[in-house]
Amino acid sequence: MKYLIVNGDDFGLTKGVNKGIVESYKNGILRSTSIMCNMPYADEASQIKEICPDLGFGIHITLDAGKPLNSPYKVSTLVDEKGYFKKGFSHSLNEADIDQIKIEIEEQIKKAFSLGVPITHMDSHHGVQSHPKVIEIFIDMAIKYNLPVRATPLDKEVILKSGVKTIDNFVYTFYDEGVEKENLLFILKKLENGITEIMTHPAYVDDELMRVSSYNTKREIERKILTDPDVIQFVKENNITLVNYSIFR
């Protein structure tokens, strides 16, 4: 059997992102999203669960965009002089305090559960989970809160060894230059048996998105492809079952 999780990253980043994710669920093949709990529109998750009853909500652990949920003095090694997360986590987290990383990750998890939506899994913004200072905390929290996780090529081996439930395949090539209908159809044709996740970033591009993200206009194209009738028909005709991470329950 071929099970497919089409996940819309970055829920909460802007209203346009949220709207694009909802549109891709209602009129397309998206069945999962992940919430940036430190972003201004994360709370909208609780408002859309009624109109998106089969949408799974994950936690998009974020350590390099926006501000932390904790007071800056509690996570001082993670933030700059203005209280924002430092950019470029691959370098900045090398000097970060592990305990501060832990309390911020757990605060984001607690925020997600407070939203009153079905929390199905954990993943991370820019793949921060794979950082050597983060991965063990990420796994420990997945175990503590009984959550499956997205595994990337950089961390799949250690996640599998931990026993945490995860996907069989992760596709991250429907992004940037790969955002073409032909590429998505190619990905779908090559799907293997098991559970595959395709990472996506659909949105309606608004002024705020242009201001806060360098990955912007391609999100609009992603949304149009995810709701394209040819894509929807291909999924139906090829016995691909659309699911979210609740399949692990």
Curated annotation (Swiss-Prot):
Keyword tags: Carbohydrate metabolism, Hydrolase, Magnesium, Metal-binding
Signal peptide: none
UniProt EC number: 3.5.1.-
Job of this protein: Probably catalyzes the deacetylation of acetylated carbohydrates an important step in the degradation of oligosaccharides.
Subunit comment: Homodimer.
Entry's family note: Belongs to the YdjC deacetylase family.
The protein, known as: Carbohydrate deacetylase
Organism: Caldanaerobacter subterraneus subsp. tengcongensis (strain DSM 15242 / JCM 11007 / NBRC 100824 / MB4) (Thermoanaerobacter tengcongensis)
